[in-house]
From Swiss-Prot:
Binds 1 heme b (iron(II)-protoporphyrin IX) group per dimer. The lineage of its organism: Bacteria, Pseudomonadati, Pseudomonadota, Gammaproteobacteria, Alteromonadales. The active site is at 98 (proton acceptor). It comes from Shewanella sp. (strain MR-7). This is Catalase-peroxidase 1. SUPFAM superfamilies: Heme-dependent peroxidases (SSF48113). The record marks 94 as: Transition state stabilizer. There is a cross-link at residues 97-225 (Tryptophyl-tyrosyl-methioninium (Trp-Tyr) (with M-251)). Belongs to the peroxidase family. Peroxidase/catalase subfamily. Its cofactor is heme b. It catalyses: H2O2 + AH2 = A + 2 H2O; 2 H2O2 = O2 + 2 H2O. Bifunctional enzyme with both catalase and broad-spectrum peroxidase activity. Heme b binds at residue 266. Formation of the three residue Trp-Tyr-Met cross-link is important for the catalase, but not the peroxidase activity of the enzyme.
Length: 728
């Protein structure tokens, strides 16, 4: 053996590639377009059988039996993590709350719909400390019911049962959340490089007076909502009230729902800070192998029960923290409060001259009592004038408070599950709620011959290929796979606010809708405008493909309903407004983010892959669907014909590409210097990015003409049917 070698054996393989030690492509070229978000949940990571259907599995579940087991778990205290006052309800509610509470309306990402709390970064966020214990307590139930019950559904159901076990009549529960199998890559949690970074820190999520960066809702990296100690850890209830209002609004909650959720969430359970935070070990992702996925383990003792440390605040909000009552408002409104420090050194509010009967029995010793506590956010419910009015109303009418909370809790835990048609189980409420974006069911069928006849009428209506395709696209492109909102079903493109969105070219849109409405009225059979819009796009694509020499039938399944204005919450739908659309080569204005990055974000929300994005952009260009009829990226002399010309000319070395302005390029003939075409960044990225160029070259090949058409049709159909949950 070489004497210079260490006595420790060398690694038998080329190490580094499977760890964080190795540099990846984005480290070397940080400005490169990262396509990973389009391929994050493919079948390679999913261990389920190809034929596994979670909806069918859940529908075979004995939900009542699961709830009985959960009820039993609530009071079955385990020595390794004892229940506060013998009841796990507060812990389970916090777990469910923090699972759902990451949702934000701006992009629909986050939320409870995927079970993402099991993975980094959420499993190791400071605000999720000790929720790893809640999930381990649930493991015997998950193990028992197996694939019939996802982690995502179980976590929310556990929160629901916890409330019911403590006396709240909940509004209902729906299953249907399918688990993911590895961390999500598409969610932007902020650009800070440290947990709980204060406002003035580099890469702050705030600008101006206190403008929170879109699409974020939480005030700090690693928090679900607001800082419980106050803005940047400095107690000031009125400043905190501003943060609370912004955060909850970005979760689709109004002031009344905000007060109800704050009070209802703090009616039960407690904060944990009876110890020193520095005694805790790393979070789960930073722990050693022997910790087996647990984190925040106390290095100087058990650190459980009465001695647990989580947020650092210490105490319960109410006198009876294992029962649903109106005690939160009784204490908040009837006592004056003063700032104190918890044993862990956190700022919290405690009552002055509290009556003995209003104190809280100690978790560790039933013969001792302690003051209840309030966070800075709780004090905001008293100090902010609007929140105070609502708090007073809830205090005077406990039944009303319970009803508002139950509905708000249902909304919180189901907001990202999508429309009611996706709900599963026997406890789905009968009521249609406006935030569920209801759509009327249809009562007609169309056979193949009727569909052919309708296509002919649409093509003879006087509308062009580009008008039909663009309108169908605009109707469907609002779909978000994050929270299953938007899409062509409902034809809300006819209604406010969508009919007036700049992205939808209102003048052109009204022309098309007028023709379609007149056609609908002339039919002897009822057909929805939603179906006619989609069918018009299909007919136009078939015509364009035929003119390119390819015979193809675009799949079409009728069954879309037409929503009414009364079914449409204008404010709620405003967040779906497109501010950019690479597929139609448009953006409302220049943004800090590059157009191609915005294209990836929109593509991911629509559930498309990189090659589907590629073929759709190439097809939309030659079909002449650019916003306002611009010619950028229309690399063809046969506009309206579904050829692969976009890719043929993009990859042709007879041309040179030159910048000609902001997001504008000229395609110049190398020999003559003549300008042949113009293009935007989202056109040229398909020739610049090495991965996208590989797809572009494949579609530019001489043998790809038919494949291009068929791939375009497949991707198009995927977009048109993205919100057809009835077809699943």
């Amino acid at each position: 053996m070489d004497k210079t070698q260490s006595s420790q054996g060398k690694c038998p393989v080329m190490h580094g590639a499977n760890s964080a030690v190795a540099s990846n492509n984005m480290d070397w070229w940080p400005k490169a377009l990262n396509l990973d978000i389009l391929h994050q949940h493919d079948k390679k990571t999913d261990p389920m059988d190809p034929k596994f259907n979670y909806r069918e599995a859940f529908n075979s579940l004995d939900l009542a039996a699961v709830k009985r087991d959960l009820n039993a778990l609530m009071t079955d205290s385990q020595d390794w993590w004892p229940a506060d006052w013998g009841h796990y309800g507060g812990l389970m509610i916090r777990m469910a709350w923090h699972s759902a509470g990451t949702y934000r309306v701006a992009d629909g990402r986050g939320g409870a719909g995927t079970g993402n709390q099991r993975f980094a970064p959420l499993n190791s966020w400071p605000d999720n400390a000790n929720l790893d214990k809640a999930r381990r307590l649930l493991w015997p139930i998950k193990k028992k019911y197996g694939n019939k019950l996802s982690w995502a559904d179980l976590m929310i159901l556990a929160g629901n049962v916890a409330y019911e076990s403590m006396g709240l009549k909940t509004y209902g529960f729906a299953g249907g959340r399918e688990d993911i199998w590895h961390p999500e890559k598409d969610i932007y949690w902020g650009s800070e490089k440290q947990w709980l970074a204060p406002t003035e820190n580099p890469n702050s999520r705030y600008s101006g007076e206190r403008d929170l960066e879109n699409p974020l809702a939480a005030v700090m990296m690693g928090l679900i909502y607001v800082n419980p100690e106050g803005v940047d850890g400095k107690p000031d209830p009125l400043r905190t009230a501003q943060d609370v209002r912004v955060t909850f609004a970005r979760m689709a909650m109004n002031d009344e729902e905000t007060v109800a959720l704050t009070a209802g969430g703090h009616t039960v359970g407690k904060c944990h800070g009876n110890g020193k935070a520095q005694d805790l070990g790393p979070e789960p992702e930073g722990e050693e192998l022997e910790a087996q996925g647990l984190g925040w383990l106390n290095k100087k003792g058990p650190g459980t029960g009465a001695n647990a440390v989580t947020s650092g605040l210490e105490g319960a909000w109410t006198t009876h923290p294992t029962q649903w009552d109106n005690g939160y408002f009784h204490l908040l409104l009837n006592y004056d409060w003063e700032l104190k420090k918890s044993p862990a050194g956190a700022s919290q509010w405690e009552p002055i001259n509290i009556k003995e009967e209003d104190k809280v029995v100690s978790v560790g010793d039933p013969n001792r009592k302690f003051n209840p506590i309030m966070t800075d956010a709780d004090m905001a419910m008293k100090m902010d004038p609007e929140y105070r009015k609502i708090s007073e109303k809830f205090y005077q009418d406990p039944a009303y408070f319970s009803e508002v909370f139950a509905r708000a809790w249902f909304k919180l835990t189901h907001r990202d599950l999508g429309p009611k048609s996706r709900y599963l189980g026997p406890e789905v409420p009968n009521e249609d709620l406006l935030w569920q974006d209801p759509i009327p069911s249809v009562d007609y069928r169309l056979d193949a011959s009727e569909i052919v006849d309708l296509k002919a009428k649409l093509l003879a209506s006087g509308l062009s290929v580009s008008e039909l395709v663009a309108t169908a696209w605009d109707s469907a492109r609002t779909f978000r796979g994050s929270d299953f909102r938007g899409g062509a079903n409902g034809a809300r493109i006819r209604l406010a606010p969508q009919k007036d969105w700049q992205a939808n070219e209102p003048e052109r849109l009204q022309k098309v809708l007028k023709v379609l409405t007149e056609l609908q009225a002339s039919l002897s059979k009822k057909v929805s405008i939603a179906d006619l819009i989609v069918l018009g796009g299909a007919a136009a694509i078939e015509k364009a493909a035929h003119e390119a020499g390819v015979k193809v039938t675009v799949p079409f399944i009728p069954g879309r309903g037409d929503a009414t204005q009364e079914m449409t919450d204008v404010e709620s739908f405003a967040v779906l407004e497109p501010l950019h659309d690479a597929y139609r080569n448009w953006q409302k204005k220049d943004y800090v983010v590059q157009p191609e990055e915005m294209m990836l974000d929109r593509t991911q929300l629509m559930g498309l892959t990189a090659h589907e994005m590629t073929v759709l952009v190439g097809g939309m260009r030659v079909l002449g669907t650019n916003y306002g009829g611009t010619r950028h990226g229309v690399f063809t002399d046969k506009v309206g014909v579904l050829t692969n010309d976009f890719f043929v000319n993009l990859t042709d070395m007879a041309y040179n590409w030159k910048p000609a302005g902001s997001n504008l390029y000229q395609i110049v003939e190398r020999k003559t210097g003549a300008v042949k075409w113009t293009a935007s960044r989202v056109d040229l990225v398909f020739g610049s990015n090495s991965i996208l160029r590989a797809y572009a070259e494949m579609y530019a090949q001489d043998d790809a003409k038919e494949k291009f058409v068929h791939d375009f049709v497949a991707a198009w159909t995927k977009v048109m049917n993205a919100d057809r949950f009835d077809l699943a």
